[in-house]
Amino acid sequence: MSDYKSSLNLPATQFPMKANLANREGGFLKKWQNDGLYDQIRQQNQGKPKFVLHDGPPYANGDIHIGHTVNKVLKDMIVKSKSLSGFDAPYVPGWDCHGLPIEFNVEKKYGKVGVKIDASTFRSKCRKYADQQVLKQKQDFQRLGILSDWDNPYLTKDFQYESDIVRALGRIVKNGHVSKGYKPVHWCTECGSALAETEVEYKDNQSEAIDVKFRIIDDSVFNMNKPVSVVIWTTTPWTLPANEAVALHPELNYVLVDIGDEYLLLAQALVETSISRYGIEATIGEQTFSGSELEGLKIKHPFYDKQVPIILGEYVTIDAGTGAVHTAPAHGQEDFIVGLKYNLPVECLVDIKGVFFKETELLGGQFIFKANDSVIEILKQANTLVKHESLMHSYPHCWRHKTPVIFRATPQWFISMQKNGLIDTVNREISKVQWMPDWGKKRIELMMDSRPDWCISRQRFWGVPITLFVHKQTGELHPNTQALFVSIANRIEKEGIEAWFKSDAQDFIGNDANDYDKTTDILDVWFDSGVSHFTVLKARKELSNVADLYLEGADQHRGWFQLSLISSVAINGKAPYKNVLTHGFVVDKNGKKMSKSLGNVMSPQKIVNNLGADVLRLWIASTDYTSEMTVGDEILKRSADSYRRIRNTMRFMLANMQAFNPVEHLLDNKQMLDLDKWIVAKTANLQTQIIKAYEQYNFHHVVQLILNFCSNDLGGFYLDVIKDRQYTTQANSLARRSAQSALHHITEAMVRWLAPILSFTAEEIWQNMPSEKNTSIFLASWYQDLTFGYENKAIDITREISPFIRKQMEGMRGEKIIGSSLESEIDIYCETDIFSTLSQLDDELRFIFITSYIRIHSLNEKNDDCIKAIEGVFIKVSKSRHEKCVRCWHHREDVGNNAKHPELCGRCVENVDGKGEIRKFA
């Protein structure tokens, strides 16, 4: 038996089957960094249309988690796809570097300020800690394959950034949006500081719910012979010492309930449920009183010797309780607002740690939550407690300490939502922005509807100072405030925030220092990131004043999206972004939020070290990120399987372009075989869909299209069909060069499709492609040399028939009748139109079905052995009775006809010893 292996064009490539991503990806990272790839891209794309995705800064504390990974990879895919589309798409990463989490970590190591460490040294330690965290996170982000200006990120602790924060504050003050007020704000007793809305999260908490009687002093309006008390319901007993009124709804009806020795005043709509809760016998009166009729009545505090009024509040509801609301203006926002209307006192009895001041009657020195029991006992002794029970309900907690927060009235600095029409302008700007998904618009509108003034001051150490001087008598700002903002910002630009803290008032305002207080508060850390449109977008020449896109998690509607919008409108009168895109949270396979306590955390570092960054990126791209994103070992395994399918497809094509040089061998589309024209046109149409999906940030659709192409059009059809032609025709034949030309076009297109998602693998493919290339795939644009518009009815028909033929062959394999499909022969019986179409392929039809013989018959020739395939087509598959050609493995009648090559079929003889076979179709 002769060996004809040397006469075959066997595939060969240096692109390995085994990806070994975890080890191989690092080499590409190093090359990108050594080559200065990001700078090369910027230089190449200079002058092209700009697309700016502005990075919302993660907090510089701890390892990056899977949520960070999703966020950064989504951004990276957008930036890379925009670059492929011909945009100059710079990407500047950022980090949030001030704030409490860093303070707490430094405190753990060095102790509290004023106890074991001075404030200046403390801030220095915070700065150093932030540097360490940024470096660690940056390395992890880079390992994910994210191309960014890593050498020039924006850090909110940088002197330049800190000074620009002060300049931004100056602009907002100048525009009349900043005010000082004594108002109740969210307060964390652990932090000892005010919290912004964005720093509060809601979770279940057990509270003590109590119903309390306030004896009505002037009860003549009721004309009753027994005392009357209005009953309130509250879940914060500790706030009762600060009570200044009881609020009723003006339009609700209230009734008297006779309980024997007195009457209780309750909302008519809540009488039945209240009596049931109290477990008492009672008679409900028939006469009703509207809330507005009872306004101004004096009532007795339940345990202090003082009188408070009945007032009216539209916010009173009948969802729970009694329809009467205990009002403590120092400890509730609605209480405070209604208190302004009635000129109620705003007296805070609680210090920064949540302890009652010593002079507080009956409760001095007690921590508020522990004081609940004391308050309940005092009420019992005063005979004013109607009901007490524990209640599990949603309650605000500090997002850092996970402890309940309170409302506490303190002097704070605010950005007023009402002054100078800020909220109205914000709402107008919301409608100009494209929100994706579209529910984002409604969500932020609802948040703005109930948006309180933004408390921007904090009573901490590590942050940008509120650089204001306030007159000791009048409370007015210094008349040279704007000039002071300029000079102070210039000093901070050179020396950092220490320039403010180490100086006294005289250093800035000279002799006026005797009349003015130098503010000691620092800015809310959300202000730092919220003004990044001013400090980064506007400040960096490679960016633009308004970002094309902000992309963050769904929680940022109440965070960075909202506060960036407010600050931008306060400074510039317009939104800082044109489009806002939201992604969902990552949950485990059971839909549960990831947490260390549940033991369900998926570490991106472990995934990358095990499977490689590209598999993790593929999972992100494959998932509909607009809702919750589910991840687990099994899901990642499926992503790894999908990755292998793509890699194997690309490897097959690279291997079959062996000895192909596009400069010498690339055929014009008109010269190519019909099947090759068809697959190139298919690729062209698919590229149009893929680019559109990228433009819509619809990455999971991109992945679906690519996988379907690999599995069906390529792996399930075209690549199988061309194997015979690739391996057996002469090396430089038109048939082989045609297929290689098609593979060249497909690979050139696909490597670009893959680049935003499988960045490392795309670069590896690029380096193994047989042509002169730029140094990196990321310097390329979408492939432009695909030919559209070719259709072929014969191919469409064969693809419809093919599954039925394969099924027949599988059955025959199962019965051991045949092994390879080349051991079979096929008879097709079809109606006239199909007969005519398929007949045009002549003997080449067998290559489409990968069989040794195909015979086409008229439909009326079919017999009972035939199986229906499609309408108008029947098939019969049988075992070939002919000898096998040792070179192409086809079973052909002419095997043995050539004396020189008795083991070869006729066409193999022609390919080995003749001019080579001629192919036109497949």
Curated annotation (Swiss-Prot):
Keywords: Aminoacyl-tRNA synthetase, ATP-binding, Cytoplasm, Ligase, Metal-binding, Nucleotide-binding, Protein biosynthesis, Zinc. Binds 1 zinc ion per subunit. A motif ('KMSKS' region) lies at residues 593-597. One of its GO terms (molecular function) is isoleucine-tRNA ligase activity. Its cofactor is Zn(2+). GO terms for cellular component: cytosol. Zn(2+) binds at residues 885, 888, 905, 908. GO terms for biological process: isoleucyl-tRNA aminoacylation. A motif ('HIGH' region) lies at residues 58-68. It comes from the Bacteria. It catalyses: tRNA(Ile) + L-isoleucine + ATP = L-isoleucyl-tRNA(Ile) + AMP + diphosphate. Belongs to the class-I aminoacyl-tRNA synthetase family. IleS type 1 subfamily. Catalyzes the attachment of isoleucine to tRNA(Ile). As IleRS can inadvertently accommodate and process structurally similar amino acids such as valine, to avoid such errors it has two additional distinct tRNA(Ile)-dependent editing activities. One activity is designated as 'pretransfer' editing and involves the hydrolysis of activated Val-AMP. The other activity is designated 'posttransfer' editing and involves deacylation of mischarged Val-tRNA(Ile). IleRS has two distinct active sites: one for aminoacylation and one for editing. The misactivated valine is translocated from the active site to the editing site, which sterically excludes the correctly activated isoleucine. The single editing site contains two valyl binding pockets, one specific for each substrate (Val-AMP or Val-tRNA(Ile)). HAMAP family: Ile_tRNA_synth_type1. This is Isoleucine--tRNA ligase. It comes from Ruthia magnifica subsp. Calyptogena magnifica. The lineage of its organism: Bacteria, Pseudomonadati, Pseudomonadota, Gammaproteobacteria, Candidatus Pseudothioglobaceae. The gene is ileS.
